Amino acid sequence: MEKKNIDWSSIGFGYIPTDKRFVANYKNGAWDEGVLTSDPMVTISECAGVLQYAQTCFEGMKAYTTEDGHIVTFRPDLNAERMESSCKRLEMPVFPKERFVDAVVQTVAANEAYVPPYGSGATLYIRPYMFGSDAVIGVKPANEYQFRIFTTPVGPYFKGGAKPITIRVCDYDRAAPHGTGHIKAGLNYAMSLYAIMDAHRQGYDENMYLDAATRTKVEETGGANFLFVTKDNKVVTPKSNSILPSITRRSLLVVAKDYLGLEVEEREVYFDEVKDFAECGLCGTAAVISPVGKIVDHGKEICFPSGMTEMGPITKKLYETLTGIQMGRIQAPEGWIKVIK
């Protein structure tokens, strides 16, 4: 199929409508078959559960054109499983895993012309989401729901190379103990908006959230997990019940251990030990890894030996290996790549 006439090198990380999106409705205790539609508009009750009580969750993933010309997605089964966890915590009906993956395949295939070519640095971003759609005036779960998937082409997250960012230790809390920090709920991101805009106004790129209970342990940022590298090249990621289980982070730990032969640790990371790490990065779907060069704790600077000019050597190897797997340049572990075409 001929690609759309898009300057792939100039598009940013924003919304560009594509031709088709998937829609399924839940009513009377069951999901319908779902359809692909050209209509990008959502029509719901003014009293819909999503509008009144934020009953919504979502996922984020990408489709790629590989080196040999295939269109693929990366570990969509894990997105389905994570969305299942989100739905259960928010008292929403689960959209079955097999149907989730099939709907992703249908949607990407229907928008094949928008999948950027190999080597462009761009990808097709995929956004599955679900929300309570019928009227709810009392505080309770909705009775009807809609599951949708739209896609949009996005440019390379880093134009001109990945430059290390500066983040601050945030005075606000992202998630409460035993709360919803471990799921991908819209309400978590709404709560982070003031904090991230405040960080930007103060000249910082991102926030480092500490645990709400003791404010001594590293959790995550508003939209990415932390990854640290020790001075003896051990890869360490924070572990907490309040952290979203990043699929990128899980994959990077496998890459570190099985592809690079590095020791890995998932454990509680105390803020006091951050100054002793050699490298720091933020990992997620959008950028894979964003290198962190400096953390500012109320005026006190922690500068990583990797510096402010480029990724640290281990972070760079992790990034290059995982993106190589996603783009088909490196053999993937079994089950990681879902071929669409």
Residue ranges and their predicted role:
Residues 1-107, 136-341:
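Helix-start/capping segments and mature chain N-termini
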Residues 97-99, 107-121:
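Charged, gly/pro-rich active-site loop segments
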Residues 110, 132-133:
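Intrinsically disordered, low-complexity linker/loop segments enriched in Gly/Pro
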